[in-house]
Structures are given as C-alpha cells and as structure tokens.
Amino acid sequence: MMENKMFCYQCQETVGNQGCSQVGVCGKTPETAGLQDLLIDVTKGLAEVINEVRCKGKEINNVYDDQVSENLFITITNANFDDQMIIEAVRKTLTLKKELLLQLDDQAVLSNRALWMEMDIEAIEKRMQMVGVLETADEDIRSLKQLITYGLKGMAAYNKHAHALGFRKDEIDRFIETTLVKIETSTMSLNDYVALTMETGKYGVQVMELLDQANTSTYGNPEITEVNIGVRNNPGILVSGHDLKDLEMLLEQTKDTGIDVYTHSEM
C-alpha cells in the first residue's frame, strides 16, 4: 500500500469514492492540499482567540471576521491552488491573531493551535505534516467534523459575497467562529456533532437569505431574459462562479472595449 501524500475527500469525484491520497483528481497537488489543511488549522486558531476576546466583553473588528470567511473560501473545491497566496493567507492570519492575543492577559486557557505563531517556511512545512483530515482517528467523528467544516466553507463563500455588497449579519460570523472551535473540543460526543451538523444547516439557510437580500437589493430580482448564447470573433472573458460584484466590476471595465464577457453557472 502506498503511503498517503495527502488526503482529501471534499468533493464527489475522489479516487474510488474514498479520497485522493497521492494527487487530487482535480489536479490539486499534495503540497497545495497540505497548505489548505494548514490554513484551516490556523483559521481555527484565530477563531479560538476571537471567541476568547469576545468572552472578555471586547468588540471584534470585522477585519478578523472577514479573514475567517476568506480563508474558508480559499479552501473550497477548485477555488484556489496558488500555493504562495495560501502561504500569504496563513501569515496574514497569524499576524491578525497576534494582534488579538495582545488583548488577552491570560493565555493559559488557549490551545496549542491558538498559540502557534511560526511564520518561516520551514515551520510552515513542518506544521503541514501535523494537521489535516486524518488527525482525527475516529471515522464517525472525523466524518461529522468534515461535514460541518464543508458546510462552514459554503457559508463562508456566500458570506464573503454578501460582505462585498455591504451586507453582513454578525450572528453568522459568530456561528462560523464558535463552530470552528467547537469541532475541536474533546468533550464533544457523536450526538453533539450530529446536533451541530443540523445547526450548521440552519445557519446555512440564514447566509443564503443574506446573500439573496444583498443581490436583489443591489441588482433587483432575477427575471427571465433572452440572451445570445453564441460566440463571436471578439476577444472574450469567461466568468465562472457567483460573485455578482466581481461581474459588475468586470462589465464596467470592459464597457465599449469590444471584449465579450461570457458567463455560466449561477451567473
């Protein structure tokens, strides 16, 4: 049996419907998978410090909430395989965490994950080998933790798009952050994880409502429209995803340039 170079079973196309362990079917390399696992780990650390600062009755600036959603969004399926950008996100997260740690006199209650602050590439590469999906031994607990995490990633994507349009709901940010901490709590039972999975679904509906409000308030209600689905000889840009703010900015920049903009999926 070959040794695992990585482990990812985030999407429905994994090798043998069990998980990619040598390289991703999507093209994700073991290095990228490891960096994404590390980014999730340091995001959990930031979330823990955010929660502790809140418990002290102190306000949290939205920049910290936004970084949590940004990090989760980076790691969703096929969103970002840029290793250098992921390393920069890790370092930015650690820098933000360091700022918040200054607000805590008693750091003894924090986990090793919350206190880890190494930024040099050697330490980052070493930490990558210590974190990831398989660090949870119990298969049932592991599966529920990942199911919740994938739910949070989807929430983070919608959350980020809503933020881009100036809409936010503090309860959603708080749920994401407290849940990132809860799933690593050793006292959680299997039933606790099942209950938290259901609660994640409830907040998933709330963030969908927030994004719908943001999109319709900004651009109006969608309506059936006839469009040309052919191609022309003009230079073109193909847009994927569902970030309407990005699309708006692109359309403004390409106005009267002769460049055709093509969309698919939710666009």
Residue ranges, per PLM feature:
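Metallocofactor- and cofactor-centric catalytic cores in central/energy metabolism, strongly enriched
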Residues: 2-267
